[in-house]
């Protein structure tokens, strides 16, 4: 696990509240120096692993409340290895954790593979990227401005 030495690079701080079923789990962590996302672990009971059948989806607890700083969001994203090797991904990706949310962060996993997948306690199930958020002033107009692209939608710019 990567632990940055320069604390100035970590500002602002991210405060976590550990829930009782998260006791004993490692804190979410950046696994390498260049990692954009911190890995989230499954807070399922050790004696009750969770099985996700092919085509099924389930919410997996992380055991933590995240106090995301104002002006930021937490983006829940799949782990590439789980997706490639097992067909396990996050159903709503990226899932947004708002800065004013104070409940437990849970991960919505879906099994797109052909075999049952067992989620065990402490398994790294997803990653969270903390990203800045811009809230826009919203105004209504009578028409859209003109651009070279215009209203061309899906596939309108071609492949090459």
Curated annotation (Swiss-Prot):
| Listed Pfam families | dUTPase
Under InterPro entries, the record lists: dUTPase, dUTPase-like, dUTPase-like_sf, dUTPase_trimeric
Q: Which residues form the signal peptide?
A: none
Q: Which residues cross the membrane?
A: none
Q: Which GO terms describe its molecular function?
A: dUTP diphosphatase activity; magnesium ion binding
| Catalyzed chemical reaction(s) | dUTP + H2O = dUMP + diphosphate + H(+)
- Keyword Chaperone listed: no
User: What functional role does this protein have?
Assistant: This enzyme is involved in nucleotide metabolism: it produces dUMP, the immediate precursor of thymidine nucleotides and it decreases the intracellular concentration of dUTP so that uracil cannot be incorporated into DNA.
Family label: Belongs to the dUTPase family.
Provide the protein name: Deoxyuridine 5'-triphosphate nucleotidohydrolase
Q: Which organism is it from?
A: Sinorhizobium medicae (strain WSM419)
Which lineage is the organism of this entry classified under, starting from the top rank? Answer: Bacteria, Pseudomonadati, Pseudomonadota, Alphaproteobacteria, Hyphomicrobiales
